[in-house]
Amino acid sequence: MSGAPRLVFAGTPDFAVPSLQALLEAGHRPVAVYTQPDRRAGRGRRPRPSPVKQQAEAQGLPVRQPESLRDPRAQAELAELAPDLMVVIAYGLILPQAVLQIPALGCVNLHASLLPRWRGAAPIQRAILAGDDETGVCLMRMEAGLDTGPVLARARCPIGPRETGGSLHDRLAALAGTLLHDRLDDLLADRLPAQPQPEAGVCYADKLRKDEAWLDWRRDARQLDRQVRAFNPWPVAQTLCQGQVLRVWEAEPVAAPAGDAAPGTVVRADGDGIVVVAGEGALRLQTLQAAGGRPLGVREFLNGRALQAGERLG
């Protein structure tokens, strides 16, 4: 292409910010940044701009916030920009075929998994829930299907034994920015071979639901541990304690205690943790949040709370 490439960036949450920054650090200022419309949030229900919008405006970049890219007017406005390439990461709006065909070099997406594993909305948490040892980021050419396009580049990332949804989110966000920065010149020069995704190994990362956060004490303690870690910081694992919702922010699996206590039974509650029997093994709760309270370490949580061995959770 002659002259500087005309790039459009599309993203919305914190996860997309490092990739926008990567474009800027590589010397490319997008001709427009697309992000979702401001959403009402907080106690005052005031419109709140997305993290990508805040970053774009801080850099003096033009921002566009259509409600939908299915709207012919929004498509016409995008076409008027005459983009060479559209970079998409966690945008949250569907790009119809008419939009995918607008940029001269097409649209590419940065996805937080090693495709074809974990296509879909929640690949970070699903990887932890499944007990995967590894994940990563894929740069792929977009098609009409859900995360089905050929992969142009990928970067791998181990999942640590105490990894949470939040910590893995942050590491993958940074990795996506690095991958984009390192491969951008080859991408713009069309030097990245497109590798079709194999059919073997395809699985889908469904959107997280709040009702998945309930801990079923009949399950293996290792599964419960993965649930606690995957759902930190949202929707946060929870159980019932003395008739009230108790959120569990941090826990770890431990050996099963002696005896035949039923799953959900508290067998110890002290400054080292609240140990609860599981279907296999036990779970030691370390950071908890009572209804209406804030997250507390177990020692502080137990101050003034009469939680005794023999009580049942759930």
UniProtKB/Swiss-Prot annotation:
Binding site for (6S)-5,6,7,8-tetrahydrofolate: 113-116
Role description: Attaches a formyl group to the free amino group of methionyl-tRNA(fMet). The formyl group appears to play a dual role in the initiator identity of N-formylmethionyl-tRNA by promoting its recognition by IF2 and preventing the misappropriation of this tRNA by the elongation apparatus.
Stated name of the protein: Methionyl-tRNA formyltransferase
Matching Gene3D superfamilies: Formyl transferase, C-terminal domain, Formyl transferase, N-terminal domain
UniProt cross-references to NCBIfam families, sorted A to Z: fmt
Transit peptide listed as a keyword: no
One cellular component (GO) term of this entry: cytosol
EC code: 2.1.2.9
Lineage start: Bacteria, Pseudomonadati, Pseudomonadota, Gammaproteobacteria, Chromatiales
